[in-house]
Amino acid sequence: MSMNSAQIRDAFLNYFAERGHEKVPSASMIPGNDPTLLFTNAGMVPFKDVFLGTDKRRYDKATSAQRCLRAGGKHNDLENVGYTARHHTFFEMMGNFSFGDYFKKQAIQYAWDFLTKELKLPAEKLWVTVFTEDDEAYDIWVKDIGVPEDRISRIGEKDNFWSMGDTGPCGPCSEVFYDHGEEVWGGPPGTPEEDGDRYIEIWNLVFMQYNRQADGTLEPLPDPSIDTGMGLERISAIMQNVHSNYEIDLFQALIKAAAEIIGTNDLDNKSLRVIADHIRSCSFLITDGVMPSNEGRGYVLRRIIRRAVRHGHLLGAKDTFFFRLVDELARQMGEAYPELEQKKQIIKDALEREEQQFARTLERGLAILSDEIGELKGNVIPGDVVFKLYDTYGFPVDLTADIAREQELTIDEQGFEQAMSEQRQRAQQASQFGMDYNQQLKSDNKTAFTGYDDVVGQAKVVELFKDGKPVEQLQAGENGIVVLSETPFYAESGGQIGDKGVLVANGPAFEVTDTQYIGKAIAHHGVAKAAVKLSDSVKAEIDSERRENIKRNHSATHLLHAALRNLLGEHVTQKGSLVEADKMRFDFSHFEPVTTEQLAQLEREVNAQVRANLPLQTQLMAIDEAKEAGAMALFGEKYDEQVRVVRMGDFSMELCGGTHVKATGDIGLFRITSEGGIASGVRRIEVVTGEAAVRYTQQQQSVLQQIAGELKTEPSSVAEKVQQLQHKFRELERKNEQLQQKLAQQAGGGLIAQAVDINGVKAIIAELDQADPKSLRGLVDDLKNQMGSGIVLLGTANGDKVSLIAGVTTDLTSKVKAGDIVNQAANVVGGKGGGRPDMAQAGGSLPEQLNEALATATTWLQQQL
């Protein structure tokens, strides 16, 4: 029975939902619970904490179709995509999971039942593998399911034993393969011919029943779990009776759409496969909040986009094409993933911008690479060439490697890495940044934070550091770190800077100049005003006025974030922030400058919420509950099971551990001071609030009044007055240029008479007194036309700058070139130049040498002609 991809996905999810499994929507491809992973690359990743026992869900069995990506780090399929039948950057992993509910027997029965009854695959076409030592699974397959022993293979630990890491949950696997029949080459799993295409793995069942200890021993888990995975693309190929995933309905629709957009009829071309695969990964990455950039996930996205664009170029694409595939992708997958349809325009805009940006350098980079390959002595493209393409023309390394492979060449990866390393060293030397001192310190203490409600608190000194080492006492005047049993001091985190203040014993004992985390301990950095010893009782007092200003700015970031999403779109996500006492800055994903009018709208919107005096409410809740309620979480941040939700009326709701005002009215006033780009796809807005915003407004008003006074007009008319002055200035510039041209023409009339003969060639070599450099070019052309055949070299000095222009009539360019002439003179005045054979110009910085420069050029011409 043939089924399309959507039908198979629905059948799988419904099958397990009908058997008591929670149908869990696909999580983001940006893992929220694992900072070690660049992307979600398996169906179990969103459940990792459940398997580890650090999280508990309201259900004990689940099913999902998880969006996955393999294009960076350890799991990197990028170079094979399009060239093999089953490699993809993006794929859907369907799975069923048990968290201590059912185990091995039920999992095997579910898999067999779904394959043979729901999908109606012939039992005789299925082949099974088990771990060599897993007799239990072997017996279930043979005795309970009835699989013949000659269609079961026992496989070793490398392929049939799964581990989450060197230690932790692990267990044996059992895999189900589909047999395409004798007409396809290949052998059963475990045989020397297993890499053939006859037997294709379709489902992997992982039985997590052990906990691997540090010494390698396996201890049985009290609640064994099940993790299974079946690739939608692979099972679709089998159900549609094709041997390549690219032949299934979903890919064929994308391939045909790409061919039509580009204008090619060769539907079997590998470049179309690459493009069809890459539009899926790129679109879903943007859906999940990733934008093209030069680092991290953003750079992986950029690499994939540029690889697709280059393959479009191979097919003859002359215009931007890649973004136009988003419509077809939304038609194919929008029902299963509504977010794709919702963010369609954002995806298209981001892809089109990136494609346009790369198009500016693609042709030039390809030409340079072609020249280098043409001059290549061996079969390895040098690392410095690969680096130049990367650094100057935006060619990702794997893109250059792709091109090399097509011509049976390789790249010098070691040489490239060496060039990259040298560049990084240069950047580090320029930045002058050192190691974070806190990273060198260790503390086993966990400080209780009391600062949400209090600005003063009693505590005991539990740890002291001096020069990075634990001590029992700090003497007066010594710099150090104090760790307390509890504290109202907020340690820098989440973009909010640490508190300042004082620790008091019998008078001020320790001035706190900064507060940071050391592990889970809150570290008070500063200088002792009196002796401080372990176990001392102190009163911790924060600088409450400074804290109030920080609270205003932090609450303002939440209002700004919500206002940005309302105004610009839901693609806006926080990329970073810095909340200080006197100002704050907010970095966010957006692909173009925020206009002046939009900035004004943002100010109006945020100040409206300030005037509304919305109450600020905080609540601790489960992370899943918070997300379901609509609380914004930052991509890539790791959150505890219990999170703090900060709500400002119905306008803003975010996960946040920082300190905030009691109501938005406490912010007072919100003013944006600047907006700009800090990286590709990332913008920054800087803001002041409260008293600082009042001072900023007054300063602006004062400057405006001063300008109005200078212009002798009212403040409301300043813009109009400036426009009038600009118009007058441009008119004067135009008249001045006309006058300079007339003066140059008059000077030119006299210059013709000064033409000298150099070995039968007429030449005009002269200095003009403070002539406009722009007018010299036209004058040289006029002189060449009047001479008919000849050479012109003119120089002028304006202040400390020298301008030189040389011209040669076309009949003489085979004998002497304008660029050579002008450089002879430029060398003398401390400059250089260049241009065409018939016209060239140069600059210099030694006006006192101009006469000598012209004489040098004359002597050189006498030698050349």
Curated annotation (Swiss-Prot):
InterPro entries membership: aa-tRNA-synth_II/BPL/LPL, Ala-tRNA-lgiase_IIc, Ala-tRNA-ligase_IIc_anticod-bd, Ala-tRNA-synth_IIc_core, Ala-tRNA-synth_IIc_N, Ala-tRNA_ligase, Ala_tRNA_ligase_euk/bac, DHHA1_dom
CDD domains xrefs: AlaRS_core
Residues that, per the record, bind Zn(2+): H554, H558, C656, H660
Primary residence: cytoplasm
Top EC class for this record: ligase
Cofactor note: Binds 1 zinc ion per subunit.
Keyword match Iron: no
Subcellular localization(s) per the UniProt record: Cytoplasm
MF annotations from Gene Ontology: alanine-tRNA ligase activity; aminoacyl-tRNA deacylase activity; ATP binding; tRNA binding; zinc ion binding
GO cellular component terms listed in the entry, alphabetical order: cytosol
Keywords: Aminoacyl-tRNA synthetase, ATP-binding, Cytoplasm, Ligase, Metal-binding, Nucleotide-binding, Protein biosynthesis, RNA-binding, tRNA-binding, Zinc
GO process terms (BP): alanyl-tRNA aminoacylation; negative regulation of DNA-templated transcription
Cofactor(s) essential for the protein: Zn(2+)
E.C. code: 6.1.1.7
Similarity comment: Belongs to the class-II aminoacyl-tRNA synthetase family.
Role, per record: Catalyzes the attachment of alanine to tRNA(Ala) in a two-step reaction: alanine is first activated by ATP to form Ala-AMP and then transferred to the acceptor end of tRNA(Ala). Also edits incorrectly charged Ser-tRNA(Ala) and Gly-tRNA(Ala) via its editing domain.
Protein name: Alanine--tRNA ligase
Source species of the chain: Idiomarina loihiensis (strain ATCC BAA-735 / DSM 15497 / L2-TR)
Lineage: Bacteria, Pseudomonadati, Pseudomonadota, Gammaproteobacteria, Alteromonadales
